[in-house]
Amino acid sequence: MFSFEGDFKTRPKVSLGGASRKEEKASLLHRTQEERRKREEERRRLKNAVIIQSFIRGYRDRKQQYFIQRSAFDQCTDSAQPGGTFCLADGPNLTLLVRQLLFFYKQSEDSKRLIWLYQNLIKHSSLFVKQLDGSERLTCLFQIKRLMSLCCRLLQNCSDDSLNVALPMRMLEVFTSENTYLPVLQDSSYVVSVIEQILHYMVHSGYYRSLYLLINSKLPSSIEYSDLSRVPIAKILLENVLKPLHFTYSSCPEASRHQVFSAFTEEFLGAPFTDQIFHFVIPAFADAQTVFPYEPFLNALLLLESQSSKRCSGVPWLFYFVLTVGENYLGALSEDGLLVYLRVLQTFLSQLPASPTGTGCPDSTSDSEDDNEETDQPNSPEDGRVSAPYITEECLRKLDTKQQTNTLLNLVWRDSASEEVFTRMASICHTLMVQHRMMVPKVRLLYSLAFNARFLRHLWFLISSMTTQMITGSMVPLLQLISRGSPMSFEDSSRIIPLFYLFSSLFSHSLISIHDNEFFGDPIEVVGQRQSSMMPFTLEELILLSRCLRDACLGIIKLAYPETKPEVREEYVTAFQSIGVTTNSEMQQCIQMEQKRWVQLFKVITNLVKMLKSRDTRRNFCPPNHWLSEQEDIKADKVTQLYVPASRHVWRFRRMGRIGPLQSTLEVGLESLPLSVSEERQLAILTELPFVVPFEERVKIFQRLIYADKQEVQGDGPFLDGINVTIRRNYIYEDAYDKLSPENEPDLKKRIRVHLLNAHGLDEAGIDGGGIFREFLNELLKSGFNPNQGFFKTTNEGLLYPNPAAQMLVGDSFARHYYFLGRMLGKALYENMLVELPFAGFFLSKLLGTSADVDIHHLASLDPEVYRNLLFLKSYEEDVEELGLNFTVVNNDLGEAQVVELKFGGKDIPVTGANRIAYIHLVADYRLNKQIRPHCLAFRQGLANVVSLEWLRMFDQQEIQVLISGAQVPVSLEDLKSFTNYSGGYSADHPVIKIFWRVVEGFTDEEKRKLLKFVTSCSRPPLLGFKELYPAFCIHNGGSDLERLPTASTCMNLLKLPEFYDEALLRSKLLYAIECAAGFELS
């Protein structure tokens, strides 16, 4: 506690010890610095005090002067009443009043004074304007500007009901009209200059913001452009909006013009549209009678966008305005104006928010009824503004109009079209497909370009000719960089990705409609006239093009999995900063977008490559081994690590995830250990481009994967748990269908042991060590796929495909039969069994495809006659309606005719020249897909229950047929000899065996095949040679009875050969046996 002892002054501290000579250096320096700091703080405090005092004195004086001038103004207004001494009909007096008001004006206190002054200025406008012709012209011009600025500020409070906006609006009208100035000043050029200066000052003072608020406040929300003549204020407001634009367009310098358009854009068009703007103002601007400087506006808009450091939030509304108003001005644009228009479309379309519903893209996930209902409502319920999603949809719809499409197509198709035109057009199309998820058939611009051969050729030429400068100074094609897997700069990728994506997408779409005859350049004669081809490339050009596309895909895979950890290079940072990206989070977002663009590019190129490969598979146009890549050397013994036992997906399978030249992080599914870069690349190739690997290697990989899975399921021991079934030989299919159903045996990967009963119900001799099961499975598949069974039919070429009428035969359980047959075929593949089942190509394609649907080009393998008729209809040049077709097909199943509508109400829709393409594709889709969809889906599910479809997708339809039935190649006797076993006293040196091989060497290839079928039940050798045959081919001593015929046990691949020492006798007996297919019962 402190006490007061009478001292009220601080006394200096006196050190009685004297000055210490031992003061340390650090202490001295610290004390000196502290004293200096205190002196500096004192000086700053005094300076700040002077500033504050000066401000207070100025504020007090201004308040005093405001009061004095306001009082003087009020005295003048009082004196200006009738009978007063102050005359308003005098220019200097008006100038004095204006000067006073401008000095003290405060909107909260002086609004009424301003209104009174406006009233008198309008009344005596000529006297006031006359001051512009005297010595006070600059002062008068400044006063008019300030008055108009206050007028704009006043109108911004138009929502206040107490404010009468008539006088401020009349003020705007009077003092921006030439009629006010010309009678007084008489110099028209000076008048125009004065009005321009006034308008520019007003624009800087929020003129368009005031008009925006005024329109939304004073016009009813239900107003439309047709109401213009009935609502006088609407016409005045519209004129006021256009006035600065017209003056700006006529004679204003470019910089000032840009300022006016900038204000108009940001303050009037940049905000979400209200009903008044959307339904009245925009249609008014779009009216041809309303003259609007559209081309200068586009130039200013492009300049404004280039100078902006960040994206404008009002892009949807600006873009809608550009498209809507441009409908009446596109035809009048100059060539330079059209190029500017193209740039504006490219810029704003890329900034347009992604479409919320898409337009039928498979990737679209917003397809619920609620979402659709929301987008149908233009206004949001909160504030009556038109929503951004609705405007976005409207922009995309307007961009797809016939006029817009023709304008853009004319730009591209003209002979003088530059590389910039093609590049920007590609960017627009790329944005439509990628960002807005619009499909080629749904957009008029896209499908028009897709079927223009000249455009596609030129597009590929641009892609091939794009180059970049390397560090060494040499120019290298960008396509070559991609093929090498070399990273490229952000600018280079932005140049080539849109072009490459567009080319791949459009060419893929055009290939769907180009039938094989047209693709291969065969002449097409219809009604005596030769049809023009839509093929943009010759077969020779396609060979080179397909090789480039293949290498590009492989290069992108290398970019996805770089050998060294990638870094964000300096040029990427610079490129991102140039578009306003500064923070790390924004940069990472841009990097992810760049990665996504590479992924999307990879997908469309891969799709195009697969389509070309499919054509080559159906009818070869490429040289042998064309699709094999010399860059990739994938061996079966190097990919065993791709099998993951724990996951039971038995495949480290993933589609291409986030890939790009910037970062290598892929979303990985279930896996045990991380893969190396080489393994990642191999996996990507095997899943996306398997045909670049030789077929033999893929077969080895497939068999190794099967073996690895079998080791997990069955194990090595012969007595592990398996499946034991008893089957009656005369009822193989019925018993197997019952006892091997999913309910009884959910896992067919287990080892199956079969016990057969003969026709009399007695046990057949023998214990199943694998051979009886193979014989059982072979007979089961023959029975199940026999057309007489009713589940499969044959084409004209004898190829199997699901019977559409199967449901009529077995009822609703037909899908279970197809599931069962799929499982059995999968079991044959799983056990490496060859079965001679010739399937139709389109059916195998449906099994391998991810969508289970195939296109019209496969129709020829199902019904060549229908295919030819549809091609005839496509090229028919007479009146199509005369053919009397409608959107129906007729099924004749089991003698019963049934009419099926291809679309709702199809029987009442005639086929015309306009809709025949749709009819053709609907017919093909019905025959190939809809009619047998449940059959194929059930069969696929059964097949996938035993063998992963991802493994099978390493092969095309022809290769799968070879995998099922073996290749039609000559039987190699040397290979067969090398892997033949002998029993019962025979050996390789036995005389009978030597005679046997001499006899077989003299057989024709057909006779050798019959021998092979006689012993193994399959006429084709194993894919990888007889070393893969299990059990091995074996010749057993059949005894010395020369009257007996050679017999075979196909379940054991065993030939029982009697001891024929006479070559002629052995030949005749053996040929008789194989021709008659002698078994146990024929001796």
Swiss-Prot record:
Keyword Cell membrane included in the entry's annotation: no
Domain named HECT: residues: 744-1083
Region ranges (Cis-determinant of acceptor ubiquitin-binding): 1-60
Protein name, per record: Ubiquitin-protein ligase E3C
EC numbers, comma separated: 2.3.2.26
Source organism (scientific name): Mus musculus
Similarity comment: family membership: Belongs to the UBE3C family.
Post-translational modification comment from the UniProt entry: Autoubiquitinated; promoting its own degradation.
